[in-house]
Amino acid sequence: MPKVIFLPNEDFCPEGMVVDAATGDNLLEVAHNAGVEIHHACDGSCACTTCHVIVREGFDSLNETSDQEEDMLDKAWGLEMDSRLSCQCVVGNEDLVVEIPKYNLNHANEAAH
C-alpha cells in the first residue's frame, strides 16, 4: 500500500502528514480524507488550478496527464516540471511526496446571477 507524504504547509498541513493510500485512489480525495484541505474550486472537474500540487517523489507512478489537465496546468502559479492537479492524479504503486504550493490561482468561471 503506497504512502502519501504531504510536506508541511503553514495553511493546509502545518506539521506535514503521512497517510496510506490504495493504488487507484484519487490524490485530492486521499488528502481530504486525511484532513488535508487542498482547495478545489471546480469540485475536481479539471476546470481550475486551485488543487495544484508538486509531486516531489513518485511522479512517474501516477497516471499520465490528459490534454485538458496540461492546458489547465499552463495557468497554474508556480508551475514546475512535477506539477499536477491533485483532482486528476491517480495514485500508483509508489510512495508519493507531495508539496502544496503556498499560492494558487482560481480559474473556475462562475455563471453570473
From Swiss-Prot:
InterPro entries: 2Fe-2S_ferredoxin-like_sf (IPR036010), 2Fe-2S_ferredoxin-type (IPR001041), Adrenodoxin-like (IPR001055), Adrenodoxin_Fe-S_BS (IPR018298), Beta-grasp_dom_sf (IPR012675), Fdx_isc (IPR011536). Binds 1 [2Fe-2S] cluster. The keyword Lipid metabolism does not apply. GO terms for cellular component: cytosol. This is 2Fe-2S ferredoxin. It holds the Pfam family Fer2. One of its GO terms (molecular function) is 2 iron, 2 sulfur cluster binding. [2Fe-2S] cluster binds at C42, C48, C51, C87. Belongs to the adrenodoxin/putidaredoxin family. Its cofactor is [2Fe-2S] cluster. Residues 2-104 form the 2Fe-2S ferredoxin-type domain. PANTHER family: FERREDOXIN-2, MITOCHONDRIAL (PTHR23426:SF65), FERREDOXIN/ADRENODOXIN (PTHR23426). Keywords: 2Fe-2S, Electron transport, Iron, Iron-sulfur, Metal-binding, Transport. Ferredoxin are iron-sulfur proteins that transfer electrons in a wide variety of metabolic reactions. GO terms for biological process: electron transport chain; P450-containing electron transport chain.
